[in-house]
C-alpha cells in the first residue's frame, strides 16, 4: 500500500506562536485495519511520520481518529478552521488599531517618552503590532486546511517574526512587572538619601539612570527574543506532504546525535519554559512583593476624598485602605490575565512534549484536544496582543483624555487651534490626598511622591506613569 493512496488530506496544528508543526494527525478506520495487518503499510506510515519529525501512534494512518465520524468529523473540523480564521482577522484588526493608537499617543506626548516605564509600554505596543501583522498569513493557512500558499521564503520570515514577537511580548510584560516594583523601591531609597542632605541631584540622577537602564534592557530583550527564535529562522521550511505544501518546523535527523523527535520536543520545551513558566514566576513574585510592600508600609496620615480623618498613630486611613484594595485588585488582574491567556495553550504544548519524549502514550483524547481545543487556545493566546493596549493604556485617565482630544481634533479639524492637543495630565480624582506611599515624614519632601503599583510622580509636573489597573 502506498501512503499517497490515502484520500483524506493532512492536518497540521499550529502552536501559540503560529509557527511550528504540533502534530500531523490522520487516522481513518479503513487504513487503520490495513496498518495493523500489513507490516509494509506500517513501515511506510512510520517513515512519513518520522520524515515530519513526529512519532506515529500505534495503529495510526492518515485520515480521522480511530472510531471517528468520517465525513461528519471532516465537516466539523472545517467549520472550526473557518471560525479560527475569522477570529484571527478580528484579533488582527483590533490589535492593529489598538497598538497603533498607543504608539501614536506615546509619540505625541513628549513628557511621557521621558518615562522609563513608558519605554516598555511603547516597545510592548510595537511588538504586539508586529505580531498581529503575521495573523493574516496564519488565517489564510487555517482556511486552506493548513496548506501554505506563500512560498518557502515567507514561511521562514513569517515563522521567525511570529516567534520573535511572541517572546518579546512576554519578555516586555515581565520587565514591566519588575519595573513596577523597582520604581517604588528606588523612589524610597532616593527619598532617604535626600533626607541625609544629598540634594535633588540624587533624584535627577536616579531618573536618568533608570531611563538609560531601561533602554539597555529593551535592547537586551529584543536580542534575547531574536536568539530564542533562531530555530524558526533555521528550521522553518515548506515540505510537500500528500501533494500539499505545508509550512512547518523540520529538524534534521540525528542532529548532534539526537533524532527529530528529541529536537521537536526540546523546541516545545523552550517555548513553555521561556514563554510561560519563567515569566509567570517572575511576574507573580514581583507583584506579591509589591502587595506585601503596600501592606507593610506605614502610610502618611491623610484625609480621604470625603474628608474623613486618617487613622491615628500612623495607620492606614480609609482612603489609603481603599487605595491598597485597588492595587490588590490590579495585581490580581495582572497575574490572572497572563495565566488565563497562556495556560490552555501551554498545557496542551506540555502534553505534546510528554508524548514526544515518550513519557505518556499517544491517545485519541490527545488527538481530539489538538483538533478542537488547541485552535481555541491559540486564539486565546493571540488575543493577548489586542488586550494589552486596553489593559495597559486606555484604562488610565490621561490616556483616555488624550484619546478624547485626538477624536475631538479629528471630528472638528477647523477648531483645532482653539483646543490644542496637550500633554496635561492629572492624577485620578480618587487619588487626591492618598497618592503617596511614603515614610511618615515624607510630607517634608514634596518634590517626590510615590504610590503603588510603582509609579513615581514628581510634584513639579512630571509623571512616571503606569496604569494602576493595568494587566501583566
Swiss-Prot record:
Pfam families in the record: 7tm_1
Keywords: Cell membrane, Disulfide bond, G-protein coupled receptor, Glycoprotein, Membrane, Receptor, Transducer, Transmembrane, Transmembrane helix
Protein name: Relaxin-3 receptor 1
Keyword NADP among UniProt keywords: no
Taxonomic superkingdom: Eukaryota
Organism of origin: Mus musculus
Keyword Disulfide bond recorded: yes
Intervals, Extracellular compartment: 1-81, 141-156, 237-270, 320-332
GO CC, any one term: membrane
Disulfide partners: 155-247
Membrane topology category: Multi-pass membrane protein
Transmembrane segments: 82-102, 120-140, 157-177, 216-236, 271-291, 299-319, 333-353
Amino acid at each position: 500500500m502506498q501512503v499517497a493512496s490515502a484520500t483524506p488530506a493532512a492536518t497540521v496544528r499550529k502552536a501559540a506562536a503560529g509557527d511550528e508543526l504540533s502534530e500531523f494527525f490522520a487516522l481513518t478506520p479503513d487504513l487503520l485495519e490495513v496498518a495493523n495487518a500489513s507490516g509494509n503499510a506500517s513501515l511506510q506510515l512510520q517513515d512519513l511520520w518520522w520524515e515530519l519529525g513526529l512519532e506515529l501512534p500505534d495503529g495510526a494512518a492518515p485520515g480521522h481518529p480511530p472510531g471517528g465520524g468520517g465525513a461528519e468529523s471532516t465537516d466539523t473540523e472545517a467549520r472550526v478552521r473557518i471560525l479560527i480564521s475569522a477570529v484571527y482577522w478580528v484579533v488582527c484588526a483590533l490589535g492593529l488599531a489598538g497598538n497603533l493608537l498607543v504608539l501614536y499617543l506615546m509619540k505625541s506626548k513628549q513628557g511621557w517618552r521621558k518615562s522609563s516605564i513608558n519605554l516598555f509600554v511603547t516597545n510592548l505596543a510595537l511588538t504586539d503590532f508586529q505580531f498581529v501583522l503575521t495573523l493574516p498569513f496564519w488565517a489564510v493557512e487555517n482556511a486552506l486546511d493548513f496548506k501554505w500558499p506563500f512560498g518557502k521564503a515567507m514561511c521562514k520570515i513569517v515563522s521567525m517574526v511570529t516567534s520573535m514577537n511572541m517572546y518579546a511580548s512576554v519578555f516586555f510584560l515581565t520587565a514591566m512587572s519588575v519595573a513596577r516594583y523597582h520604581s517604588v523601591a528606588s523612589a524610597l531609597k532616593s527619598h532617604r538619601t535626600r533626607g541625609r542632605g544629598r540634594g535633588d541631584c540624587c533624584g535627577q540622577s536616579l531618573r536618568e539612570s533608570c531611563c538609560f537602564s531601561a533602554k539597555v534592557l529593551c535592547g537586551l530583550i529584543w536580542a534575547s527574543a531574536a536568539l530564542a527564535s533562531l530555530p524558526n529562522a533555521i528550521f522553518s521550511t515548506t515540505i510537500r506532504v500528500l501533494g500539499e505544501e505545508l509550512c512547518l518546523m523540520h529538524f534534521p535527523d540525528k542532529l548532534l546525535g539526537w533524532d527529530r523527535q528529541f529536537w521537536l520536543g526540546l523546541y516545545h520545551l523552550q517555548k513553555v519554559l521561556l514563554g510561560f513558566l519563567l515569566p509567570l514566576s517572575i511576574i507573580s513574585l514581583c507583584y506579591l512583593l509589591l502587595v506585601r510592600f503596600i501592606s507593610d508600609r506605614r502610610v502618611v496620615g491623610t484625609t480621604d476624598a470625603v474628608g474623613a480623618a486618617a487613622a491615628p498613630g500612623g495607620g492606614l486611613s480609609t482612603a489609603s485602605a481603599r487605595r491598597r484594595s485597588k492595587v490588590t485588585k490590579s495585581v490580581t488582574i495582572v497575574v490572572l490575565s497572563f495565566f488565563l491567556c497562556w495556560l490552555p495553550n501551554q498545557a496542551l504544548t506540555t502534553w505534546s512534549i510528554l508524548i514526544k519524549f515518550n513519557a505518556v502514550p499517544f491517545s485519541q483524547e490527545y488527538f481530539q484536544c489538538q483538533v478542537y481545543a488547541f485552535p481555541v487556545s491559540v486564539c486565546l493566546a493571540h488575543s493577548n496582543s489586542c488586550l494589552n493596549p486596553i489593559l495597559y493604556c486606555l484604562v488610565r485617565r490621561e490616556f483616555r483624555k488624550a484619546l478624547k482630544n485626538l477624536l475631538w481634533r479629528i471630528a472638528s479639524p477647523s477648531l483645532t487651534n482653539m483646543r490644542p492637543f496637550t500633554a496635561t495630565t492629572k492624577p485620578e480624582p480618587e487619588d487626591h490626598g492618598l497618592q503617596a506611599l511614603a515614610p511618615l515624614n515624607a510630607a517634608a519632601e514634596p518634590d517626590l511622591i510615590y504610590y503603588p503599583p510603582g509609579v513615581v510622580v514628581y510634584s513639579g509636573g512630571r509623571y512616571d506613569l503606569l496604569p494602576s489597573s493595568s494587566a501583566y
